[in-house]
Amino acid sequence: MAAAAPAVDGVPGRGPPGEVIHLNVGGKRFSTSRQTLTWIPDSFFSSLLSGRISTLKDETGAIFIDRDPTVFAPILNFLRTKELDPRGVHGSSLLHEAQFYGLTPLVRRLQLLEELDRSSCGNVLFTGYLPPPVFPVKRRNRHSLVGPQQAGGRPAPVRRSNTMPPNLGNAGLLGRMLDEKSPPSPSGLPEEPGMVRLVCGHHNWIAVAYTQFLVCYRLKEASGWQLVFSSPRLDWPIERLALTARVLGGALGEHDKMVAVATGSEILLWALQPEGGGSEIGVFHLGVPVEALFFVGNQLIATSHTGRIGVWNAVTKHWQVQEVQPITSYDAAGSFLLLGCNNGSIYYVDVQKFPLRMKDNDLLVSELYRDPAEDGVTALSVYLTPKTSDSGNWIEIAYGTSSGGVRVIVQHPETVGSGPQLFQTFTVHRSPVTKIMLSEKHLISVCADSNHVRTWSVTRFRGMISTQPGSTPLASFKILALESADGHGGCSAGNDIGPYGERDDQQVFIQKVVPSASQLFVRLSSTGQRVCSVRSVDGSPTTAFTVLECEGSRRLGSRPRRYLLTGQANGSLAMWDLTTAMDGLGQAPAGGLTEEELMEQLEQCDLAPLASSRGSLPSPSPRTSLTSLHSAFSNTSLSSRRGSPSPPQAEARRRGGGSFVERCQELVRSGPEPRRPPTPAPRPSSGLGAPLVPPKTKLNETSF
């Protein structure tokens, strides 16, 4: 073997193609030839061996490269054979290393492999995309208004549109937002003005809150989702969002559909018009930071952990504030509102009735139950059984405590005077219970230990919870969801894991593992089984999500649909069909090529033209080279000989005459045409003459 060219300042000089190069990659030794490492131009290895990159050698003289040797092994195998064998290495890790080494053919092949499951049009569950709306003008009047009394009686200006707003890109929403920086949030964390902070839905309506304004969409059967309301720009970031889109009976007129937002201790309420537009109802003050904002029927409820609750009645147009014990949880069912407090008490409010005492104008708030251990009630769930008689519903309440306990209490309509009775107790959590859900078939609890979930199967008799055989343990799993420390992952209220869904149907958790993730995992709340996973179609991080139970079409045979709504960091909104995902649960996925099958197909072609380095390519297998898309000689042979009869010499060599190289040359010249039968040719002479001499055309090494 020829000696290598002398090195200059410790850098390997140019040597013969057959020179053996010793590498130390992350402590593991590899040996290969210079030709193998340098056949791709402008790569890390060609720069390294040409002296353009300084080298560091170990004690044995091998060139040291501080990279992962496990990932380097399939990369070196690709350089040797042009065939990719991942050898158990994850595709993203392999792509990252291929990009580091500058191996363009391998990078393109791996990028194509990644496109198997990625599409700008989403997958079969993707059902809609709403671009960012136009940034509204600033609200002119910021004086606090109570009830229907507005300044001058004029409603706030709103955007009226029945068509989809254009996506203006940098000239629209984001560009105008960057010109006018949004103020910092009350927590002092930086804000991303263009990202979706909160999403909520009710029936066929969606409300989307950005940093300083909100928009509402309505689903129409013929035209799809239409923008019907855009609020003025507010002074402070929106922290809470609530929407009610239908009140049974429709007796409230324009207040049948309302949307509300909270910023700090201030609450803004608008009435929505079905055909577009809206008017400001008023601005209300709770006096303390609003930590929960929701509708119970036509009543707007705002609560704070300090123990203050505010109620706005759509009929009386009255805003009332009441002090109770510090509130740690709440839930509503029908017209009942339950408040869990840190002293172990559960308070009850019937918001459907006139909620005021005539003598002192206080809310009718009464204590329903007190925890036996007086632990704080940190989670609440109310389940109303179907009416089995004229006496009313059987009320079942599950609650979690600050000590990790889970209790179920029940109250029969005939025993209202005696209060609820303790039914079951579970002590399976060692951290405070943060979420609890009692549904028709399951009891689900989540604690503060990385969202640890425990589930039980609930036995019922005639719709009522039964002790025979009683609740039985079902599953234990975790819904890991990390929160952002700098506020860039979205509003915490917009990333609630759930569970979502009706209490008489399968419910799901939505899992976003890291704050900047663009992929969400949908899992059954009862067992933790994965239903599906969705990835943002534009690659932007998901900053808010929710699940919407949408009314079915009026067409015969239609049924309600369940959608996953995802708000993105760039301001767009995507919709995913969870009904289809639930219907396909448990079915084996049927699709096209697997990753292995695709890689096998890609081995037959070059995805990157490398005409300048054809003469220095290593020798791949005959199958790979003969089907190469970039073999210039093969292409010209096909075009020049298409339709021409095969010469007798070619037929003779196909029958076994000549050397291996000669047969390969003849195959390339004739071109592979598997669909065309070979043209008959006379059998060559069987005499012992001199071997037939092939034409003078030369082939490069890739051709065989």
Swiss-Prot record:
N-acetylalanine carried by residues: A2
Homology family: Belongs to the KCTD3 family.
UniProt region (Disordered), positions on chain: 145-165, 611-704
GO cellular component terms listed in the entry, alphabetical order: lysosome
Disulfide bonds: none
InterPro entries found in the cross-reference section: BTB/POZ_dom, SHKBP1/KCTD3, SHKBP1_KCTD3_BTB_POZ, SKP1/BTB/POZ_sf, T1-type_BTB, WD40/YVTN_repeat-like_dom_sf, WD40_repeat_dom_sf
Pfam family, one: BTB_2
UniProt entry keywords in alphabetical sequence: Acetylation, Lysosome, Phosphoprotein, Repeat, WD repeat
Subunit and partners: Monomer. Interacts with CUL3; interaction is direct and forms a 5:5 heterodecamer. Interacts (via PXXXPR motifs) with SH3KBP1 (via SH3 domains). Directly interacts with cathepsin B/CTSB.
Signal peptide start-end: none
Keyword S-adenosyl-L-methionine: no
Name of protein: SH3KBP1-binding protein 1
WD repeats by residue range: 233-280, 283-322, 324-359, 428-466, 548-586
Motif PXXXPR per record, residues: 618-623, 678-683
Cellular localisation: Lysosome
Bias type Low complexity, positions: 611-644
Main subcellular location: other
Role noted for this protein: Inhibits CBL-SH3KBP1 complex mediated down-regulation of EGFR signaling by sequestration of SH3KBP1. Binds to SH3KBP1 and prevents its interaction with CBL and inhibits translocation of SH3KBP1 to EGFR containing vesicles upon EGF stimulation.
List of residues that carry Phosphothreonine: T163
Repeat in keyword set: yes
Modified residues (Phosphoserine): S644, S646
